Amino acid sequence: MSDSVILALGIAAFTVIVLVLVAIILFAKSKLVDSGDITIDINDDPEKAITLPAGGKLLGALASKGIFVSSACGGGGSCGQCIVKVKNGGGEILPTELSHINKREAKEGYRLACQVNVKGNMEVELPEEIFGVKKWECTVISNDNKATFIKELKLAIPEGEEVPFRAGGYIQIEAEPHVVNYKDFDIPEEYHEDWDKYDLWRYVSKVDEHIIRAYSMASYPEEKGIIMLNVRIATPPPRQPDAPPGQMSSYIWSLKAGDKVTISGPFGEFFAKETNAEMVFIGGGAGMAPMRSHIFDQLKRLHSKRKMSFWYGARSKREIFYQEDFDQLQAENPNFVWHVALSDALPEDNWTGYTGFIHNVLYENYLKNHEAPEDCEYYMCGPPVMNAAVIKMLKDLGVEDENILLDDFGG
């Protein structure tokens, strides 16, 4: 065989090998790399279907088309709120989802939208209320301290717009990359003692990505044109002083009147039941927000005659806020009473009211002698330790799960 023939055969063989490898790569790319447009059918309604380029996660794909699914953690897979039903497509459920979705739900197709890859056509089922969710660019009206570690952020909604929320609902607030220096916070002198004691002024919050977090509303539907939040600054725990501070709470605390803020909503499921049962509200810390929203809505908008009481736990007297508002509601409504318990009253407080943890105070001074505590509805929001203690106490009293309503935000 001549050299020219051997060379030709070698070139041909090499070409075949290259073509085969290219074919393999293209095949693999078609399977592994997202490309082209895909269609997501929603709720079996052709008018709700969306078409968009493949790639990314389902949560982001929906948001890009103006469909905002609740995600308090901003798509990190930790809050478990963005649950949707995937009827077709999306691949197998991931281990990261199984802490929020049980086996029965997984079998029925429930997934976390933030974990579902958008690689091909899909069919999903979304709650109808999601289609009422919108985005607004709001303006900061005020951002004042109500307690040592709690600010009341008041936002103006764009003129002519309305956020159609229900009492107990929440919104999501967004922030672009930023740097916040705690030394720049505007904090009244009366709250400086703890800030100086723990040298909280030293902290800096640096965020390199777009973030989203959820906050319960302190306002109620009749307060038109505004959204009010109670935001607790998330400083590092004493045992981990070098841990980074909370990203969104730091951002919110840095806001000043006139600043622009993007929110989306409304969301929520912490709504009052439409019954005549007695309502018992239990709150602590920034868990005040949904308590205020609910109680104001019941008494000011609905003019409810249901028997209701509010039990709020604070450390000391200067941590009590909205006191005049609740005092006035109590004076005007014979069906409503409210109580505060201080867990760490200061000598200068000259406090003569309840002391101790709020779950103990509620039990010893009311529920222990209540003729039917299991028939009441309990609405609570506060620090995790408080929530757990209240729930245990209610369970011991025979209260069923359906009458224990918990807001996981605001504590």
Curated annotation (Swiss-Prot):
Grouped into one coarse class, the protein's main location is membrane
Q: Where in the cell is it found?
A: Cell inner membrane
GO BP? sodium ion transport
Necessary cofactors: [2Fe-2S] cluster; FAD
The main enzyme category here is translocase
Q: Which gene encodes it?
A: nqrF
Q: Does the keyword Transmembrane helix apply?
A: yes
Supply the EC number(s). Answer: 7.2.1.1
Task: Identify this protein by name.
Answer: Na(+)-translocating NADH-quinone reductase subunit F
Its source organism is: Haemophilus influenzae (strain 86-028NP)
